[in-house]
Amino acid sequence: MAETDPKTVQDLTSVVQTLLQQMQDKFQTMSDQIIGRIDDMSSRIDDLEKNIADLMTQAGVEELESENKIPATQKS
């Protein structure tokens, strides 16, 4: 086997470390973007739920639902 030049090993180690750091930075950036988008979607879903509840209240759906519910003891 041929001996490996220490300078070559050192250069290869440096290149691999740089590559791994770049990959870690890219994954961190993507992770931050994904978390930001999930937070944004969560806020939008909360707003939608509130708007739907408000619309149902305005339409009187809650009143209609409570009027249509008959307790099990009163059913024939």
From Swiss-Prot:
Single Gene Ontology MF annotation: identical protein binding
S-S bonds: none
Compartment list: Nucleus
Extent of the signal sequence: none
Single biological process term from Gene Ontology: negative regulation of transcription by RNA polymerase II
InterPro entries with a match to the protein in the record: HS1-bd
Function: Negative regulator of the heat shock response. Negatively affects HSF1 DNA-binding activity. May have a role in the suppression of the activation of the stress response during the aging process.
Subunit structure, as described in the record: Homohexamer. Associates with heptad repeats of HSF1 trimers and probably also HSF1 monomers, and with HSP70. Association with HSF1 trimers and HSP70 coincides with attenuation of heat shock response and the conversion of HSF1 trimer to monomer.
Family (UniProt): Belongs to the HSBP1 family.
Name assigned to this protein: Heat shock factor-binding protein 1
Organism: Homo sapiens (Human)
